[in-house]
């Protein structure tokens, strides 16, 4: 409670001093007011009832008042009760601090004494001047009253007003009443902020006593609904009536000019017929003063009053209450999930909106009054006292109200703070804002449950593990800033769920997800043989957060974020065949950004994965990755994301399945973790909170290196990749792009994918599939198999040694066209795509033209096979080409296909081919996680005696 009082008193200090400073600058006439009050009937008198007793030994408040009054030049008089009664009769203000009598302005000593004896007020006023003694408190109060009266009553001839009971006296009484109200409001603000609506109501009632302002008084009196029980939504809706204008103001896409127009309409409704009422009042004063009230003068007054109304102020109020209404609706769902923070935020918006609406309505009306009076008084010496009086009153009210808003706002924020602290007290060990993230996650889970329950079928996995990163939430950030609890808020929270057979399981016993230590353990697979680990949203880097709130200015604070980072994620798999898509795991950290938001300095988080048993698939992300495939047939995919071309050189590797993958990621946009700043405002107080989140940021090019162990197959990127195989059996899939693939030694399986690729099988019995694009294929030494399909484009094959085969896996042999073009054999399918076997006829032609020529090369493919297993040998091709003068006739091909002996030979050869390629993998390069990523299967259907080569989708 002490801290609360200190905070409020500090705000009061600022408000009081600023008000005094502002009043001292209101003009020369106001500056002279204090001196004029010390002479004649304008003097201030401290009245002490004759029978009022006080203990001089205890040094109570009244003694301090007397001493302070004497020092300030204020007359001190003890009077009989009947003299005090005169003051009460004059204005009925003996219960107030101030009264007005024939002798001057009366300060009621008992009332001031009571104020100073209130502990809270004494503390507040004392702390405002850094004083603790009663004398100083008394002096502060009296000097403040002098300052206010100096402005309110500047330029007034009180002697004449008291004698004639003129209109000016009515205004003087109203000014004095307003001053009384303001003094009470300031003196009791420590305990009456909740009742601010009532204060406004009282002020409205007092304004009704001023001739011509009854309409304004009625409107302000209507603000009494702004108390802590109703908090203003209904009242403000009534006050800010006018559906059309309200809709315009609520429209975020409405233009400024349209909002201004709507604001004028709305403002006129707020103050009723304020222009008319104030104009009539001012014209009446001019008549009383014997001044002109002609049409042009009236028009000048009315236009000046209208211009004094600020429409945009009311636009802001409408927006604030619309926001509160939206928050209330939004909060309903999360309240059911155990989080009431959005409702607290709505409560804050309603509370501060109430204050804003009240102050803005009053200031708007007062500005209209002051503007109209100034217009009426233009060029008139007689009317100057009225203008000065009204300007003084409106200036005092506006200044004090405006600079009291911060204390009022902080009071509303303190209530929010206390509710959060109380919740955490009643829920030991829990964090209120973390509870907010929990509720957000549960709502997200509910919204997506149907989709998630269908993932087992979509991903064709017995178990699906879904990891969700709940990232920074602006509402939670606002609440943390408003409540001054930014040190407790988190940047987000990660959650894990499991799904089996369309059922949602508790994942805490199946999966270990520790974001603080960087651990993801999915090895407890139970009876599940296949599982898919899906990162639904970008997962932030591992580590722990700590925040520190520091003050950077009078009202400016920043909550700095300090991160104790862990340099890697450690992933552990078990016996199941698992698929990991790591492209949504954030590995790049933007340490420094330029003014445009481009990353200029980065840090990397490594991923270390131990896959265990099973046939696993890993889709690599943007940073360094170490993978130990363990047992089973494991594939590493680089086909998702845009993380640079691969360069693999395994020529010196000493273990099968070991590769070093170098990547260069060119400049562009990629997923980064960056630190941003959230800003929340509480009146003048600005709270900045640092938080981290993921975002696609522009970056410079960078290198990264992956280490693979016990990996059976690598799928490349959409860039131009380079693969150099080992001396062992390699399986490379180039993916998209113009790839260069060299199998080196071993029996390799090489697939080009899309693009015009260059593939060299090297030594060994290689399986080569160029894929789509115009590819250059070289078998090298060994018994190689080439594959071509319709839609693959125009391929060129160079072959030298071995018993080689070419399969047109989706074309009938008799539908192909064979012809000799120069030294080459060109085979054309029904799509007019050509496969050119380079130098097929070169050796034979050399033998014909060069005497005693001995062939040194075998550039032919020994068998060419159709989709149903039908085939033609190189010998048959030569014979039929020669017979057909460079082209095989269609009838001759038909005979080959129909020949029984060839078919029998085809079946025998198919059995041999089946043994050769039965271990070949089904190549995959799909970006669709729903594809079946199967284990290796035979690619021969013996029942059809046909070769069926699986390909990338």
UniProtKB/Swiss-Prot annotation:
This is Leukotoxin. The lktCABD operon has a complex mosaic structure that has been derived by extensive inter- and intraspecies horizontal DNA transfer and intragenic recombination events. The keyword NADP does not apply. One of its GO terms (molecular function) is calcium ion binding. The transmembrane domains are believed to be involved in pore formation in target cells. The Gly-rich region is probably involved in calcium binding, which is required for target cell-binding and cytolytic activity. It is a multi-pass membrane protein. The keyword Calcium applies. It comes from Mannheimia haemolytica (Pasteurella haemolytica). It is found in: Secreted; Host cell membrane. One of its GO terms (biological process) is killing of cells of another organism. GO terms for cellular component: extracellular region; host cell plasma membrane; membrane. Belongs to the RTX prokaryotic toxin (TC 1.C.11) family. Acylated by LktC. The toxin only becomes active when modified. The chain crosses the membrane at residues 230-250, 297-317, 359-379, 381-401. Pasteurella leukotoxins are exotoxins that attack host leukocytes and especially polymorphonuclear cells, by causing cell rupture. The leukotoxin binds to the host LFA-1 integrin and induces a signaling cascade leading to many biological effects, including tyrosine phosphorylation of the CD18 tail, elevation of the intracellular Ca(2+) and lysis of the host cell. This leukotoxin is a major contributor to the pathogenesis of lung injury in ovine pneumonic pasteurellosis. It also has weak hemolytic activity. InterPro entries: Hemolysin-typ_Ca-bd_CS (IPR018511), Hemolysn_Ca-bd (IPR001343), RTX_C (IPR013550), RTX_pore_form (IPR018504), RTX_toxin/Mannuronan_C5-epim (IPR050557), RTX_toxin_determinant-A (IPR003995), Serralysin-like_metalloprot_C (IPR011049). Keywords: Calcium, Cytolysis, Hemolysis, Host cell membrane, Host membrane, Lipoprotein, Membrane, Repeat, Secreted, Toxin, Transmembrane, Transmembrane helix, Virulence. Hemolysin-type calcium-binding repeats lie at residues 715-732, 733-750, 751-768, 769-786, 789-806.
